Amino acid sequence: MEESDTQEKIMRLIEKSLESYHQGKYDEAISGYDEVIKLDSEYGDAYYNKGIVLFDQNLFEESNKCYDQIIKIDPSHKEVWLNKGVNLFMLKKYEESIQCYDEVIKMDSKDDMGWSNKGESLVCLDRYEEAMACYDESIMINDKSAYVLFMKSKLLFDLEKYKESIQFCDKAIKAGPEDSDVWFCKGNSLKKLGKNEEAEICFVRAKELEK
């Protein structure tokens, strides 16, 4: 098969596999990506997309096999290191996930997700001060991520810094969209401070959002 014909076939397979993925036909999508890999064993996008399909099925180890193949081809692919770190986090391999996020940060010190994801892994290892520093770095880069603002408020709550926790809950609510977990966190902090009426208002709002 000529090179141009091979490329044409690859593009058709990629397109069809993406369509299958969006239709929830994961097995078909994976088969398509495997066909691409047979035609070109260094076609990074096929491994990357296959990794995402496997992640969506909670097949984290299998997903990382795909990402490892890409790293062999191109170790400077930032998103691959980020995704690999998430898979390792899901497998509760927190130290290994941190190594991946460090690779991301080494490539791009302004990657807010690299910092925030590293923070989450550090929390799971009870390394709270380091985690807080990571959340702070992430927020300095992007102060509009409601999720990271909430993760910081949650950590502050666990460290019994209730007033500060409330401040970051408010920032998360402002950044939006509203989330019941943020309102519950704010309510719990208010309750710890003896502000029961204000806490109840937060709990009511949290329950409304859960409906």
Annotate each predicted stretch with a short phrase.
Residues E8-L39, D45, N49-D56:
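Alpha-helical segment of the N-proximal tetratricopeptide repeat
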